[in-house]
């Protein structure tokens, strides 16, 4: 009797095992999706990294690139942000933007990236808006449609953005809470004449249908670019310059072995690099110089 059971169960187990292996093989054959983290104020370093990420994904076999966005604004000018939006608009592969995870923000000029991306989604608890005057890309003003007016001066949560049709992906009330859901959202879409295949369906050992997402490759700023990005925010840059000058003056008026001077010089260099990465404004420079008089 036991032998008969083994004879019957053996092929069934082999079939389910084969289905599991087939599902794994299917996932392996799917082209990967690149995910690029974009966080903090958009400075020249981050703007360059966005453009380079698009070029990299076009050349490394990715079927799409997702920008995970969490930013409260930009310190680059409108012209530089226009170049970033143009790079997204002219990408040869689909570009998706996910404002997430929950609590993330897409404010200021960077929020307008959602208007030119192919697929856009938000996590519940995320907000977008405060875009200011809309930029123009290739002679046409970017737009969120009926949501333009509300987004320029205010902000919208997920449900409001979906209601105003500011997002380019229709989903249920849960939004897109995690990155895996963003991969599910891309599956089956045809963008820029590219049919996205990011999920493979198969039966597991219990006979239940499982969904396996394609391989995800994560990218973010390297050590030096990340350091420069950190010091390129106005508060950090000015604080480093102030500390650097204070330590240099302290070393000048006291007898020491040079530790304060060394630390001050490092802070001053980093602060100067941060200020150099910021967009210049004549009035701001005048106030900065006046502060040290």
State each model region's role.
Residues 176-293:
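Non-cytosolic juxtamembrane linkers/loops
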Residues 15-231:
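Soluble extramembrane regions of membrane proteins in the secretory/endomembrane system
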Residues 6, 31, 35-38, 121, ...:
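Preference for short coil/turn "hinge" residues that link or interrupt alpha-helices
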Residues 2-15:
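Bacterial N-terminal signal peptides
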């Amino acid at each position: 009797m036991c032998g008969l059971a083994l004879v019957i169960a053996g092929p069934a187990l082999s079939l389910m095992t084969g289905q599991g292996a087939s599902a794994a093989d299917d996932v392996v054959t799917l082209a990967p999706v690149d995910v690029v983290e974009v966080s903090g104020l958009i400075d020249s370093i981050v703007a360059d990294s966005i453009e380079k990420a698009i070029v990299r994904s076009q050349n490394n076999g990715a079927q799409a690139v997702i920008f995970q966005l969490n930013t409260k604004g930009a310190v680059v000018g409108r012209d530089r942000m226009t170049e970033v939006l143009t790079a997204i608009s002219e990408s040869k592969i689909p570009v998706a933007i996910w404002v997430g995870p929950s609590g993330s923000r897409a404010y200021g000029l960077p929020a307008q990236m959602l208007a030119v991306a192919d697929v856009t989604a938000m996590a519940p608890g995320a907000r977008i808006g405060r875009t200011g005057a809309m930029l123009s890309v290739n002679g046409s003003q970017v737009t969120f449609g009926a949501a333009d007016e509300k987004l320029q001066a205010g902000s919208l949560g997920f449900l409001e953005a979906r209601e105003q049709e500011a997002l380019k992906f229709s989903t249920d009330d849960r939004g897109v809470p995690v990155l895996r859901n963003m991969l599910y959202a891309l599956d089956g879409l045809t963008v820029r004449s590219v049919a996205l295949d990011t999920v493979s369906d198969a039966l597991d050992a219990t006979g239940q249908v499982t969904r396996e997402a394609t391989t995800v490759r994560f990218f973010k700023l390297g050590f030096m670019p990340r350091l420069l990005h950190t010091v390129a925010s106005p508060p950090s840059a000015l604080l480093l310059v102030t500390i650097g000058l204070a330590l240099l003056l302290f070393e000048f008026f006291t007898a020491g072995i040079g530790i304060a001077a060394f630390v001050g010089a490092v802070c001053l260099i980093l602060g100067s690099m941060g200020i150099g990465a910021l967009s210049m404004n004549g009035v701001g420079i005048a106030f900065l110089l006046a502060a040290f008089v």
